[in-house]
């Protein structure tokens, strides 16, 4: 294991569940994220909430040297990436312990190491 590394914690949520839950649930979740950020400020190196998947634009190569630009997410799935945190941790185990604290009541998180220190 490396001495200290950076990890991307990607937050995936089901937008339909959030829509059904309404603004009070969203506001409560924002508060939980603020609390998470305050409790883990020593490890956080960045993070942000992303716009809804309906605002996404995907770019794919067309196989002829050009590109195809389409509205929508790259992959069509029920859960979409709604935000992320960049964290610094001693190792993957520590990163996972931090990631377990990320509020994600309508989905979950995925943790990946940043290659070559970012």
Model-derived regions: residue spans:
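Conserved, structured core segments of small domains
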Residues: 1-118
